């Protein structure tokens, strides 16, 4: 889930759903693809992209794994203690007045997942996907 913050010269505030939507639809979308069903009252859910990087237990190298054929009915399982790197399906084009922070949804935290705290995107961060670090 991404929380988007509006920066004015004196204040910072969380964007409401209608503000996120207005900035994600149109000619210069802040997040693309924008899926309306993923919009929450003050945040936007993001989707893991088709590839993750998994640590090889034999030599600690990262191995690219294609998870694109996995679904809710056929999930790719993150084993206890396992750590993976992934990236969002979404590409971000934040204007100079908006920053974003990735936080784990509480339902995933209750399932035992954790993520590193590197999920910050500065104002003006554009043309990139967000790297996410997940651990079970």
Give the ranges of each region predicted by the language model.
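Non-catalytic terminal segments and appended small domains
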Residues: 1-136
């Amino acid at each position: 889930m991404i929380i988007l913050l509006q920066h004015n010269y004196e204040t910072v505030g969380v964007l409401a759903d209608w503000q996120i939507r207005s900035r994600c639809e149109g000619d210069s979308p802040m997040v693309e693809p924008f899926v309306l069903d993923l919009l929450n009252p003050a945040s936007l859910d993001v989707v893991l992209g088709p590839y993750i990087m998994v640590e090889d237990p034999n030599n600690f190298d990262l191995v690219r794994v294609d998870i694109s054929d996995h679904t809710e009915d056929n999930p790719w399982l993150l084993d206890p203690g396992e750590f993976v790197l992934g990236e969002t399906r979404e590409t971000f084009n934040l204007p100079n007045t908006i920053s974003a922070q990735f936080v784990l949804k509480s339902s995933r935290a209750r399932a035992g997942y954790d993520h590193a705290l590197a999920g910050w995107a500065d104002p003006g961060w554009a043309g990139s996907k967000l790297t996410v670090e997940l651990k079970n």
